[in-house]
């Protein structure tokens, strides 16, 4: 059984027991969270597709950890002008473990 839900402007395909990395959520570590923007649920040959969201279906997950991703370097370089600008960025993320699809 798997489901497709939306979080942080992205769609994620998950199954029970899977750990995924989402955009930062303002939820404490160890707490349970429910995602109600489920777009599709498949259980064998039984497939339900929302238009765009399924009513009454939720994906339950437990927050495992928060953190920051790898650094991405941004470089702006102008040739022959002796001009260069460097910047770095580390995106916040939340790891969640899917506990149920109902």
Swiss-Prot record:
Keywords: Ribonucleoprotein, Ribosomal protein, RNA-binding, rRNA-binding. GO terms for biological process: translation. SUPFAM superfamilies: L21p-like. It holds the Pfam family Ribosomal_L21p. InterPro entries: bL21-like, bL21-like_sf, Ribosomal_bL21, Ribosomal_bL21_CS. The keyword RNA-binding applies. It comes from the Bacteria. GO terms for molecular function: rRNA binding; structural constituent of ribosome. GO terms for cellular component: cytoplasm; ribonucleoprotein complex; ribosome. The keyword RNA-binding applies. Part of the 50S ribosomal subunit. Contacts protein L20. NCBIfam families: L21. This protein binds to 23S rRNA in the presence of protein L20. Belongs to the bacterial ribosomal protein bL21 family. This is Large ribosomal subunit protein bL21. It comes from Proteus mirabilis (strain HI4320). The lineage of its organism: Bacteria, Pseudomonadati, Pseudomonadota, Gammaproteobacteria, Enterobacterales. The gene is rplU.
């Amino acid at each position: 059984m798997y489901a497709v839900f939306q979080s942080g402007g992205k769609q994620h395909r998950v199954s029970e027991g899977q750990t995924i990395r989402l955009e930062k959520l303002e939820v404490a570590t160890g707490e349970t969270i429910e995602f109600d923007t489920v777009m599709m649920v498949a259980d064998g040959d039984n497939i339900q597709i929302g238009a765009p969201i399924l009513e009454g279906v939720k994906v339950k997950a437990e927050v495992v950890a928060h953190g920051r991703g790898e650094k991405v370097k941004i470089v702006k370089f102008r040739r022959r002008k002796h001009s260069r600008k460097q910047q770095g960025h580390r995106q916040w993320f939340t790891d969640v473990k899917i506990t149920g699809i109902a």
